[in-house]
A protein has these predicted regions:
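Short-chain dehydrogenase/reductase
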Residues: 36, 40-44
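Conserved beta-strand segments of the P-loop GTPase G domain that flank and frequently precede/overlap
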Residues: 71
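Oxidoreductase cofactor-interface core, primarily capturing Rossmann-like NAD(P)-dependent enzymes
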Residues: 2-37, 53-59, 63-65, 74-84, ...
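Contiguous, function-dense segments enriched for cysteine-driven chemistry
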Residues: 31-35, 51, 89, 269-281
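Rossmann-fold cofactor-recognition segment
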Residues: 44-54
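A hydrophobic C-terminal alpha-helical subdomain
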Residues: 224-281
Length: 281
């Protein structure tokens, strides 16, 4: 069985490949798909050029591949077309397992990130590919900038209100992807994956305080206050508005659900918030 991991030189892709190797996969059976193949040389597996914007590179990378992990692209607004190119190539190549990293409740969520993931899930379903959907909650590592800022100022400011986030470490999500790629019995499943504990931003402030050794206060912001603050910090209006919309989604509960599925897949508890933050502090 040959496994292709797209976005293999990114933060998640690297960890997926490491998890595959840790679970006994033959390095020669793994292909790291990357826009810049030179950056994949340290992964210890085969590498192939794969550029989401170059369909010919995708088709070549998929030649002879049995299973694909499509790590969702990072270019918001461009992802559906990029994902379509991979889906089409996988269908043409006769891929027998297609795994996609989606977003929580992608088909029903009002989270600003959800529409592109919903569209991608619909494309996968329409393709008829034997698929597994991994709806990943937030990565704890997403809060690296918040940790650094709070360590400097003693304040965690956000528009997330009392919303809860069932985050886990990237390694947790990467292990789940490796399990699904290597094991039988997952085709047709849509897994909602999150950490064992859904925490709020008061909890986050406390966790940051624990790892930084200084008091940290959570300061809730209105949407207007947050938008003004982000623009004052140098963000353009579009980017600032996107961040505000993300936090509004958190406030509404878009990231709060957790049912233990991630822990069951990886065979251990998910990484606690404090431990995840300690790795990036």
């Amino acid at each position: 069985m040959t496994i292709l991991v797209t976005g293999a030189t990114g933060n998640l892709g690297r960890l997926v490949i490491a998890s595959l190797l840790e679970r006994g996969a033959d390095p020669q059976s793994i292909i790291a798909g990357a826009r810049d193949v030179a950056k994949a040389e340290d992964l210890g597996v085969r590498a192939a050029r794969l550029d989401y914007t170059d369909p010919s590179s995708i088709a070549a990378a998929l030649d002879g591949v049995d299973s694909v992990l499509l790590v969702s692209g990072s270019e918001v607004g461009q992802r559906v077309a990029q994902h379509q190119a991979v889906i089409d190539a996988a269908k043409a190549a006769g891929v027998t397992k297609f795994v996609y990293t989606s977003a929580p409740k992608a088909t029903t969520s009002d989270l600003v990130l959800a529409p592109e993931h919903k569209a991608t899930e619909e494309l996968i379903a329409a393709s008829g590919l034997p698929a597994v959907i991994l709806r990943n909650n937030w990565y704890t590592e997403n809060y690296a900038a918040d940790v650094a800022r709070a360590a400097e100022t003693g304040v965690l400011a956000s528009g997330a209100g009392d919303g809860r986030v069932a985050s886990a470490s990237r390694k947790d999500f990467a292990e789940a992807a490796a399990v699904v790629l290597l094991e039988d019995g997952h085709i047709g499943q849509v897994y909602e994956l999150g950490g064992d504990v859904a925490w709020n931003y008061t909890d986050l402030a406390g966790a940051i305080a624990e790892v930084t050794g200084r008091d940290v206060e959570y300061k809730p912001l209105t949407a207007d206050e947050q938008l003004a603050g982000l623009q004052a910090a140098g963000l353009d209006e579009g980017t600032a508005g996107f961040v505000v919309a993300l936090d509004a989604g958190i406030a509404s509960g878009a990231l709060s659900d957790t049912d233990g599925t991630l822990a069951r897949l990886i065979g251990r508890p998910t990484t606690p918030l404090v431990d995840g933050l300690r790795s990036i502090a």
